[in-house]
Amino acid sequence: LSTARLAAAVANEGGIGLIAASGMPTDELRYEIRLARSLTSGIIGINIMVAARGFSEIVKTAIEEGIDLVVAGAGFSRDMFGLGQESGTPIVPIVSSVKLAKISQRLGAAAIVVEGKEAGGHLGTSTSIRELIPDIAKAVDIPVVAAGGVLSGQDIVDLIKMGASGVQMGSRFAASEESNAAPALKRFYLKSKPDDIVVIHSPVGLPGRAVRNPFADKIMVGPVPPKGCKAC
């Protein structure tokens, strides 16, 4: 949902705009990065799932395009730190434990995103972000960015008081004008109620929070065989 327009809009307001790069063809990624650069002079990065097909190629392409940072979650890759060090590109892993936070710092992470159980999408913990932040902030010396269920200014204030250096927000912008989501998906999202939020077992092998839909209903019953899935 976050392509050049949304990333640039966030960057223009002083944030770090992230392009969702998971599964994106490299030529499309180059286009989105260049488009974002034409729309802002702010900081632009990519967010990518380590579990996604073509992870290394996507990271290398983004680095070739001069991306400002790489944020990576849904798995953990030691190799990405080497790519970052070779090019001088900050690598920011998404973690959910003190142990992985310490490992990330040791491997050369520029910062870490700490994601709690409240997050949308793939989940790495059953612990609340408000429980994770104080412990992890004390355990490392690099910036700690809180993520998961951050919806308001008060949430930001609370998390910074707990030790976070900043926050990452995703779902809050899913239905924004700049979001790349289809209008029908935005309407579906806005009409959803709290009871419509479910946790499924994602096709990449991780639990994930989603808005209830026919596919989510099927996958909660059991594995759904892919039809024509490339590289499964």
What are these regions (language model features)?
Residues 1-143:
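Active-site entrance/lid segments in N-terminal catalytic domains of soluble metabolic enzymes
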